[in-house]
A protein has these predicted regions:
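Residue-level detector of anion-binding/catalytic polar loops
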Residues: 11-12, 37, 112, 232
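Conserved PLP-binding catalytic core of the aspartate aminotransferase-like
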Residues: 208, 235-243
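A structured beta-alpha segment of the ubiquitous adenosine-cofactor-binding alpha/beta core
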Residues: 1-33, 215
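Hydrophobic residues in well-ordered beta-strands that form the structural core
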Residues: 14-15, 40-42, 235
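Beta-rich nucleic-acid/ligand-interaction surfaces
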Residues: 123, 202, 241-243
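Aromatic-enriched alpha-helical interface/lid elements that frame and gate functional surfaces
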Residues: 153-233
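Conserved N-terminal glycine/acidic-rich loop preference
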Residues: 9-15, 50-54, 201
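Active-site-adjacent "lid/gating" segments in soluble enzymes
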Residues: 22-165, 169-170
Length: 243
């Protein structure tokens, strides 16, 4: 049955441990003998070759080795896993794009690709900023929670009700001025918040001011009010709220 499927298919995708397909008699040479035009995509934890190829891998391993968890967490806190194990879906999405590209390339060139997708590399594609920061400065970036390295405010703030939150972010002085006018009529002219550098320097105080304003308001009310004046804000949605 498998040979019949391979003979009439465009792509074979496997997510076995390294060497399993060959042990089953369906390594790339055997697959190509059945169908010379078959595209083969092999998904693994650490790639099909190299010193780590045979290591065990689950989703958290990809985030650890790629540096994602080292960049995740609050100031002064430990490295933290993300809310979902991004390595699993991330590897699948990376493979899907690679297969689509391979199909297009085969149409143009007649060459069938063999694709090697590792979970570590898939996760690493999401960690560009910390890597570049290290290359530029020689220092490991500090964990900053929900904050941004440059912009403030940039945080998830408490709203009224149980476990309700709303994200608010400003990346220009104009956006800040509009937000500040809503928070306090005198705040737009406050010297300690006038520029992006000022706001970042006084971020802790700024977060306290915004939290004091949001905590007594419905998270949707906050989002709609701020979106109406061109400030990026949206409630943090739980699975229950989404359903």
């Amino acid at each position: 049955i498998i040979e019949q499927l391979v003979g009439t298919s465009d792509v074979v995708i496997d997510n076995f441990g390294v060497g399993t397909m060959a042990d089953l008699g369906f390594g790339i040479e055997e697959l190509r003998a059945i169908n010379p035009d078959i595209i083969v995509a092999s998904l693994s934890g650490y790639g099909q070759t190299g010193p780590s190829a045979w290591y065990m891998a689950y989703g958290p391993a990809g985030g650890s080795l790629a540096g994602l968890y080292a960049a995740t967490g609050y100031e002064g806190g430990p490295a933290t896993e993300t809310g979902i194990s991004i390595g699993d879906p991330g590897t699948g999405m990376t493979a899907a794009w690679a297969v689509a590209a391979a199909l297009a390339a085969r149409t143009r060139t007649g060459i069938a690709a063999a694709i090697d997708v590792s979970m570590v590399e898939a996760v690493a594609s999401t960690v560009g900023e910390p890597w570049m920061a290290y290359l530029a400065t020689g220092d490991n970036p500090e964990r900053i929670g929900n904050h941004d390295p440059v912009w403030a405010p940039h945080e998830c703030y408490p709203a009224s009700g149980r476990d309700n939150w709303v994200t608010i972010a400003c990346t220009t002085d104009d956006e800040w001025q509009r937000l500040a006018a809503v928070l306090d009529p005198e705040l737009p002219n406050a010297p300690r918040f006038l520029t992006a550098v000022d706001r970042k320097r006084n971020e802790f105080e700024l977060d306290q001011i915004i939290s004091a304003w949001t905590c007594g308001r419905d998270h949707w009310e906050v989002a709609r009010q701020l979106q109406a004046i061109g400030v990026a804000a949206f409630p943090s949605q739980s699975p229950q709220a989404l359903w």
